[in-house]
Amino acid sequence: MKETYYLNKDTLPVMPVPHDNIISNITVDDEFVTFILETDPKDKDDSIQYYKPGAKGLIIRYHTERDYLIYQHRKTRRPRILCKLFRPRIHYVDVDENKLEALARDKYSLDYIEHFVGYNTVIVNLYAKSSIYLRMQADYVEYEWLF
């Protein structure tokens, strides 16, 4: 079952926000950034099951023109003696956009935490050993519920 939400209309859509789901795959092509989310059968509070009971997974496709930015939360490493004197420096760094697909294949599981929607803009919050923000220009979003 497919649902389409347009982000370039006069009013923003009311769309479900899946949260705390594991991303099994990410694909990037010329038009779409696609996240494939899977349900956790052990989790009684699964957000995909909450929005569509009986769904096994969800495919989210953001229609974009490869115009996106990726930021990852990092902490600088300092020698132990300096850490006692100074707090570690925490900041966000740019991640190469070609590494977006590799994030799902990392040894740490990649979680889809939430997303924020604005006019023609989406900010996706991911998590894999640290916070990752994906900011992109998108004119519509497709949800495909897998049963």
Predicted ranges, named:
Residues 1-147:
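Surface-exposed, interaction-prone regions used to assemble/regulate multi-protein complexes
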